[in-house]
Amino acid sequence: MKHYCNPMNLEYRYQFFRRPNQSGKNDLYKVYREAADPTLIAFKGLYYLFPSMTAGFFTSEDLHDWNYYRLGNEIPVYDYAPDVRVMGDYMYFSASRNGENGSFYRTKDPRTEAFERIPATFPFWDPNLFIDDDGRVYFYWGCSNMEPIYGVELDSKTMQPVTEKQVMIRSHEDVRGYERFGEEHVAPHTDADIEEQVENMISMMKDQAKEEGAELPLPEEQVKAQLRGYFSNRPYIEGAWMTKHEGRY
């Protein structure tokens, strides 16, 4: 058995966020490393690695030496948490798209051919495609402290749902202590703390929008409602990944 070093020696990108209410010329940006949420598959004799925000993918014959390939404009290269799966002769790609319907993309060789788009009919975040041994196709998604992990069966040719979406996993922090935020599983934020965070964030968002000559993306009360959920003490349920081993899902 071979063992491989982690972290891997790969180039990755940075993301620069402009700070609202800058305190000085040397404090204009926050800098974040990227290339999270990787999917790794074996496809036609090569390993393929697709990380977030990399605008491309890596290939390797041995999991040690990697080559980078840039993705084309036909695919949403900056959508987070790309999921890549093999179905027949094709590699299928999807990535996170909230607020509008996502799509699936497929190709027989991403190094030399463009991806073909297959429109989807619903939005999703943190997607995971699963092809069962009998050829039936299932799709899972979710990344929220307000929504559960969902699942749905898809038509293998059209990639359209053939069932209604089903709730797979919900948080139950009221009965499962390990799901609770905070040291010693004690909620770290009071209602007053949460409201203060919401007001601070709204103020920052308004300042940034004003600088850019824009408006808030939604009415202020809707934004506040979303922020209250974001800053709440509820745990995030995310990163769905279905696999099958010795007959067990």
Q: Which role does the model predict for each range below?
A:
Residues 1-249:
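Carbohydrate-active catalytic/glycan-binding domains of CAZyme proteins
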